[in-house]
């Protein structure tokens, strides 16, 4: 019986002084361990998704952690019968998730995590507003019942939406949500930087929430758009084939 291919996704906001220096080291260990995928490096941290044997993807992650020294890393592992990636790429970027706002230090300045098991109770409180930080085509596929849709085409439009909707956010506990956690984590840093104190985000994002809770209280409506060959998943994480992939 063939071993399943492990697909490891990981990100962390951590200050990396010279990210370009890490590229040859990560390419070397990745290729030696027959790992494929993409790792993005920036001064603000790393964001990667790569596939191989369970042992080897974890060895690459260990090297990434050793080289960058993060306090915490958000990690998720799935399995496949085949490699979803053709080769290993390690790329230098200005940001690991592009918001186009200078001066944010997400590592030091971000909102509080809400665990998936506590999310439903938290977002049904009267003084909480839920903001879905994903792009509009993702929100149209599915979102939380009470979530506000900023109707953005790209994440770079989100800061302008925040500036234009300060009355909506005033006096509220702000709960941010996104697919896997990275975008909503950076969003909390933006809001904290402009003076909002009570800012929160769903740990692990929508996918972790659906996995952990099975949407038992039916607060999630629709499906969750994902950027892989599944296109979208239902609330039990089963693939839905009718949604076409957008990047």
Curated annotation (Swiss-Prot):
Domain of life of the native organism: Bacteria
All residue ranges annotated as the Rhodanese domain in the record: 124-218
Gene Ontology BP annotations: tRNA modification
Record's keyword annotation contains Amino-acid biosynthesis: no
UniProt keyword annotations, A-Z: Oxidoreductase, tRNA processing
Top EC class of this enzyme: oxidoreductase
Record: active site: 178
Enzyme Commission number(s) from the entry: 1.14.-.-
Ranges in a coiled coil: none
A Pfam short name: Rhodanese
UniProt xrefs under InterPro entries: Rhodanese-like_dom, Rhodanese-like_dom_sf, TrhO, TRHO_N
SMART domains in the cross-refs: RHOD
Family: Belongs to the TrhO family.
General function of this protein: Catalyzes oxygen-dependent 5-hydroxyuridine (ho5U) modification at position 34 in tRNAs.
Protein name: tRNA uridine(34) hydroxylase
Organism: Rickettsia africae (strain ESF-5)
Chain's gene name: trhO
